[in-house]
């Protein structure tokens, strides 16, 4: 319940913080902590909460691009928002479990490796599925945004949509990996 509340608060706040034309995802860190503490299913559930808040931002117009997609096709917008969140949380949990618990021992080094790997995989899955969703489900909107920016679709996706947000999300997750290890370590010792 605590992780759910943290995710809701962080993502609502993030809905109003923009780096370039898009909002940054701040909720991946608590998803990673939940996935590390409670496993891949918990990561998927927490990712679903994150996706629901992102969808709410689209519906309420907090995310202007998301609002355009919602008005164009609510079902596909919900599919992208919820799907990318759920799968990012699931992937983080699976990667953490495979690395941190992959051997017979659950050492702090394995936990750190698992946290770092999960911290990389989660934003890659989140951003990757978002881009694939736009490319395959909303190509006319993606083309219009790219044309409006004077870019090709691929250039727009890489340099406008991914560059700033993805790098910031990745750095935040990597920095917080050490915090995640401490939380998991403290819990396993109690």
Segment roles from a protein language model:
Residues 1-190:
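Loop-helix junctions at membrane interfaces
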């Amino acid at each position: 319940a605590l992780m759910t509340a943290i995710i809701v608060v962080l993502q609502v706040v993030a809905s109003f913080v923009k780096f370039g034309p898009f909002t940054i995802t701040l909720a991946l860190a608590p998803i990673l902590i939940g996935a590390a503490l409670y496993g891949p299913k918990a990561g998927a559930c927490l990712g679903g909460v994150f996706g629901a808040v992102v969808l709410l931002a689209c519906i309420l117009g907090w995310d202007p691009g998301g609002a355009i997609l919602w008005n164009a096709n609510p079902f596909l917008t919900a599919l992208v928002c919820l799907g990318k969140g759920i799968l990012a949380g699931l992937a983080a949990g699976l990667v953490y479990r495979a690395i941190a618990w992959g051997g017979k021992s659950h050492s702090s080094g394995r936990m750190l490796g698992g946290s770092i790997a999960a911290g990389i995989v989660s934003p890659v899955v989140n951003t990757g599925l978002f881009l694939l969703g736009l490319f395959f489900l909303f190509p006319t909107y993606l083309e219009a945004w790219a044309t409006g920016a004077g870019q090709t679709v691929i250039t727009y996706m890489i340099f406008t949509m991914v560059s700033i947000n993805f790098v910031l999300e990745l750095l935040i997750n990597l920095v917080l990996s050490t915090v995640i290890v401490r939380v998991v370590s403290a819990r396993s010792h109690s």
